[in-house]
Amino acid sequence: TTQSGNTVIKTLNWMPHIGMNFDLYLDGLSILFSLLITGIGSLVVLYSIGYLSKSEQLGNFYCYLLLFMGAMLGVVLSDNLIILYLFWELTSFSSFLLISFWREKKASIYGAQKSLIITVLGGLSLLGGIILLSLAAHTFSIQTMIEKVSDIQNSPFFILAMVLVMIGAFTKSAQVPFYIWLPDAMEAPTPVSAYLHSATMVKAGLYLIARMTPIFAISEGWVWTITLVGLVTLFWASLNATKQQDLKGILAFSTVSQLGMIMSMLGIGAVSYHYNGTDSQVYVAGFIAAIFHLINHATFKGALFMITGGVDHSTGTRDVRKLGGLLTIMPISFTITVITALSM
């Protein structure tokens, strides 16, 4: 159905008298993210079976992981913005539980608290934007808002709503200056880093930008802000990655830089709303490139994180100054690392 451009909408009544229902909206974008969430999530679950010790609280770990997976699916499938926000905050809560899984490590607790504070505050910003949008469009439905986009653009709340939504997206996807939570979150178990911080949670902000672009792209402020913030994030994080000596630290800043690249591509794609014909198609290529690299990054960066976990288990260190000669002792991992690194 979605291959032919059609969409699937399913409504589950919850509080219809105030316009809050579970409106599930399935199109190409939501299917793509759903496949990433469930596909890579399944691989991470299989990986964690061998990675985590049987003496650890595996039941709790899998419960937290599946809770996060369900929350992410709720984010990408919700058409009602209030429901999307509830799932959005649930991803922050479940990620806190996962990052702090090794509670005996103070660094894990600190990283989890930092992540929770920044992403929850960003979520509150998003909630403010949602409320202002609902005042302008008299609905919480994203698709209905797109149909009423002229009313929203003429509303006095338009600019403020746009800024608040962008802040919510930037905090979740670790854009400058909100990226500071992601490196500290690397104290989580490697399966968590592979899943949350390369394939899913950090992609939620990118999903929100892509989903809300039809509403806000008419504003040059939306286009320029997304593009410039993405480019600044790309270069700043790339520079910081070269200074790291911990493998996960390198991957953390590399992830931030790639998120910035995808964000800037979405900004370039949003320019298509200002042109018609051939000129529009040129900028649409930015959207296509963003989605392609989103899939590419989620797949191969997740693999790099899991290989890093294998190196840590085998050698007892992630310090690149102490690692050498891994080709002879881990030839398969070396080959996979080269392939996945080249994809970046």
Where are the regions a protein language model picked out?
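...captures the hydrophobic TM-helix bundle architecture rather than a specific catalytic motif
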Residues: T1-M344
